[in-house]
């Protein structure tokens, strides 16, 4: 009983922290581009709804697709870390300024769109995890883990859509 109380408290603190961080990031985007938050939230909700309908119709993510998604996710994480390291070590180098210039143009929009597609496909994996958890009759603890994964997936999709909209808006200027 006591352990469950600590876990509940930790989850609440984590959720509040995540909410504040998400609000802070959204406010930064909102200061730069008017109306972008409403657009991002609307597109995120529409995407989740469409993906839920598609999943309910029987479309599934195969094992090869899951492997490709995880690979893409790891490549993007490692690439992002390398970019941050380059920005920290050599912010005025030709390589860094070239990457920034490319990232703010059409190629950056393309990569942002690919990020949205990866986030959407990962959401399909979350739907499958939830379905398998329920069908196999796993304990409620695993249902909570699966629902947590879904929430993280929706937040990730929102951030990717927000990034894509910002790149599109920035490219119009």
Predicted regions and their residues:
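Small-residue-rich segments of transmembrane alpha-helices in multi-pass membrane proteins
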Residues: 15-28, 70-83, 148
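Hydrophobic alpha-helical transmembrane segments and adjacent interfacial helices
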Residues: 20-31, 49-55
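C-terminal transmembrane helix-loop-helix hairpin of multi-pass membrane proteins
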Residues: 102-173
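Helix-coil boundary and interhelical linker segments in multi-pass alpha-helical membrane proteins
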Residues: 24-37, 170-173
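Cytoplasmic-side transmembrane-helix entry/capping segments in multi-pass membrane proteins
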Residues: 8-18, 37-43, 64-74
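Short, small-residue-biased leader/transition segments that mark boundaries at the very start
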Residues: 1-6
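Structural signature of hydrophobic alpha-helical transmembrane segments
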Residues: 11-12, 34-46, 109-119
């Amino acid at each position: 009983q006591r352990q469950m109380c600590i876990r509940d408290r930790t989850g609440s603190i984590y959720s509040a922290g995540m909410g504040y961080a998400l609000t802070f990031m959204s406010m930064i985007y909102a200061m730069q581009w008017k109306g972008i938050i409403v657009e991002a939230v609307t597109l995120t909700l529409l995407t989740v709804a469409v993906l839920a309908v598609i999943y309910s119709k029987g479309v599934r993510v195969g094992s090869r697709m899951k492997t490709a998604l995880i690979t893409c996710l790891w490549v993007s994480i490692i690439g992002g870390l390398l970019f941050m390291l380059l920005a920290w070590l050599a912010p005025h180098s030709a390589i860094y300024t070239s990457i920034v210039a490319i990232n703010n143009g059409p190629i950056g929009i393309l990569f942002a769109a690919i990020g949205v597609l990866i986030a959407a496909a990962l959401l399909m994996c979350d739907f499958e995890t939830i379905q398998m958890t329920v069908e196999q009759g796993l304990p409620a603890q695993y249902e909570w883990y699966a629902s947590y994964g879904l929430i993280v997936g929706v937040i990730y999709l929102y951030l990717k859509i927000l990034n894509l909209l910002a790149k599109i808006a920035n490219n119009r200027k």
